[in-house]
Every structure is written in structure tokens, then in C-alpha cells.
UniProtKB/Swiss-Prot annotation:
This is S-adenosylmethionine:tRNA ribosyltransferase-isomerase. It comes from Acinetobacter baumannii (strain SDF). The keyword S-adenosyl-L-methionine applies. It comes from the Bacteria. It is found in: Cytoplasm. Monomer. Pfam families: Queuosine_synth. GO terms for cellular component: cytoplasm. The lineage of its organism: Bacteria, Pseudomonadati, Pseudomonadota, Gammaproteobacteria, Moraxellales.
Length: 351
């Protein structure tokens, strides 16, 4: 399967660079189990879900992971904190005119807080901070909004690039689980009143989510690693949901990857799991847990577009995207949403 199979043309003006005034006011394109698409508003999910269905949400919180700073020579640098193995050590991306070497001292924030580059961890720099990292990020950092916004983070992003249900103890993502940004408290309350249940997984989104696929044959692509947790409480609710014939609805590709990673770790069984995942879902993948997916519109040739193409199929997804472009849906993190049903497989009866 070739990378070019997942290409499409997107006019620049359809990229949403700011959020709508109301989270749930976005549009929704429903791609059903027969591969047919239908136009809706996002709040129509109340009617598209059944009592007893289960929403699975990613409760991670985005950290202000981008720090501006300088070298001892005064040259500008930018640090993007990706992971924190402990409270004073971070694995980071560093933008600089020349790549810093082990032992280099850098300074971040208005108060010139010193940090030391200790070496490399895979493709990331190991950076030691002179004080706990999270307070430094909170005081001096910026939210690492996506590059396709073509702007710096603003005050509005502080609220709107976080989900309303994030767990403040789980602050470790460098990008939002953006499908969840459509949910506000009022919509969640209405779903609760209908009897739609909800539960949580955690996947801390890494900067690799924005990395392009660089291999023509997509099966040669190596996914970035992200930490996730699928707790037993969530598994119990999933098993109960499937036992009564209801649907498991993953909110976002991150929740999907967490759930399917747990299943893959147990040989296809539905079971709790915590660990690092590099799961790469593309057409041909057999989903173990997810029945339906709420997701945004994704970049051409991205691993996320490949994932959604595995749930329906590539032709259906690209046809839906073509309709979305013609009908002026908005794309990417602050854009509109899709509800994608797992494609029905027709089984022929032989007489």
C-alpha cells in the first residue's frame, strides 16, 4: 500500500486555525457501516447513539511543553518537552542553529533557568533541569499548538486546546486529543441523561503525531512511541457493553490506539494494560474493541488518515473527505468532526 494512496487536495482556507465560540457547535459527517455519508451537527450524536453505548475518552492533559531560551553564547533555542522520566529530567526536541552536544548548558524562560543537555535517548535530547520541570513549564512554557495553525499560542488556546474532562494529574501530552474538544459539559450531561455511559483511558500524545510518513510503502513506516493506560474499570465497562449488544465508541484516534494496543498486548483479548505503544493501524487491521470512532478530519498521507481508513475503508474515507471539501467542512484540530462506523462485511451464503 503506497503513501500516495492516502493523498487528497485540501484548500488552505478549510484549515481551522481558531476554535468556534461554542465547542459543540461544529459539524459532523457520519460515515455509516454501509459506507454512506450523512451531514449532521455535532450535537446530533445524542440521536446517533443508543442507551447503553459506551464512550471511551482520553483524559490526558496538554502541558505547556514549548520553552524558548538561549545558549551561553546568546543564540536562540527552543525546547519541546516530549516525556519526563522523572521530575527534573526530560526527553526533548531542541531547535537550534547547531545541535547542542552533551554537557551544553542552556537557559530557558525570562529568569534564565539553567538546564544541561546530558546526551541522547533515541532521537530525543536528554535534558536535566535545575528545578522541577512542570512548574517551569507552567510559568514559562507555551502550549505546543499544531504547526498548521501558522501562529503562536494565544490566551484562547489555554482553555480551548484542552478537553473539559482532562485529569489535571495526567499532564504529559504535547498535543490535545482533538476529537474530544467538541464535547462541552452540556452535551456530556445530555448524553448521560440518555443513558450513554462514559469511561476513560490515558494516552499521552507525543510530538510524533505531527511527523510525516517518509516511506513510499506505508508498511515500512515506524510509529513513534507513546505511553498509555487502559485500566481494569474501563475493561469491565467494555465487556459489559459488548455483552448487552451495545457499541464501544472511541473518541479520537488516541483512545482508539490505547484500546487496540491493550488488545494486541493480550493476543486480541479485551484486557487491562499499561505500557508504551507503537501500534500502527492501517487498512487490513482487524479491530478488537472499537465499533465506532469520533474523530476530526486528518492531514493527507498521515498515519491518522490510515487509521480511519482501516475502520471503514480507504475508498469510503476519501469519498467522504471529497464531500467534506466540497461542502466546506473545516479540517484538523479545531475543525469539524466525523463519526465513523466499522464497515459491515457482507458474508455470502453458499447454497
Amino acid at each position: 500500500m503506497q503513501l500516495s494512496d492516502f493523498s487528497f487536495e485540501l484548500p488552505d482556507e478549510l484549515i481551522a486555525r481558531y476554535p468556534l465560540e461554542t465547542r459543540s457547535a461544529s459539524r459532523l459527517l457520519h460515515l455509516d457501516a454501509k459506507g454512506q455519508y450523512h451531514d449532521h451537527m455535532f450535537t446530533d450524536i445524542i440521536d446517533l447513539f443508543e442507551e447503553g453505548d459506551l464512550l471511551v475518552l482520553n483524559d490526558t492533559k496538554v502541558m505547556k511543553a514549548r520553552l524558548k531560551g538561549k545558549r551561553t553564547t546568546g543564540g536562540a533555542i527552543e525546547i519541546l518537552v516530549e516525556r519526563m522520566p522523572n521530575h527534573t529530567t526530560a526527553y526533548c526536541h531542541i531547535k537550534a542553529s547547531n545541535s547542542p552536544k552533551a554537557g551544553a548548558e542552556l537557559f530557558v524562560g525570562a529568569d534564565n533557568i539553567p538546564v544541561i543537555v546530558r546526551g541522547r535517548h533515541e532521537n530525543l535530547f536528554v535534558v536535566e533541569f535545575s528545578q522541577p520541570i512542570l512548574p517551569v513549564l507552567e510559568q514559562y512554557g507555551q502550549l505546543p499548538i499544531p504547526p498548521y495553525f501558522n501562529r503562536e499560542a494565544e490566551e484562547i488556546d489555554t482553555e480551548r486546546y484542552q478537553t473539559v474532562f482532562h485529569n489535571p494529574e495526567k499532564i504529559a501530552s504535547v498535543a490535545a486529543p482533538t476529537a474530544s474538544l467538541h464535547f462541552d459539559e452540556e452535551l456530556l450531561a445530555k448524553l448521560d441523561q440518555k443513558g450513554v455511559k462514559k469511561t476513560f483511558v490515558t494516552l499521552h500524545v507525543g510530538a510524533g503525531t505531527f511527523m510525516p510518513v517518509r516511506t513510499d510503502d506505508i508498511t515500512n513506516h515506524v510509529m513513534h512511541s507513546e505511553w498509555c493506560d487502559v485500566p481494569q474499570e474501563t475493561i469491565d465497562l467494555i465487556l459489559a457493553t459488548k455483552a448487552r449488544g451495545n457499541k464501544v465508541i472511541a473518541v479520537g484516534t488516541t483512545a482508539t490506539r490505547a484500546l487496540e494496543s491493550a488488545a494486541q498486548a493480550h493476543g486480541g483479548k479485551i484486557a487491562a494494560w499499561t505500557g508504551d505503544t507503537q501500534i500502527f493501524i492501517y487498512p487490513g487491521y482487524e479491530f478488537c474493541i472499537v465499533d465506532r470512532l469520533i474523530t476530526n478530519f486528518h492531514l493527507p498521507e498521515s498515519t491518522l488518515l490510515m487509521l480511519v481508513s482501516a475502520l471503514s475503508n480507504r475508498e469510503n474515507i476519501l469519498a467522504a473527505y471529497e464531500h467534506a471539501v466540497k461542502d466546506r467542512y473545516h479540517f484538523f484540530s479545531y475543525g469539524d468532526a466525523m463519526l465513523i462506523d466499522k464497515l459491515e462485511v457482507l458474508k455470502l451464503k453458499l447454497g
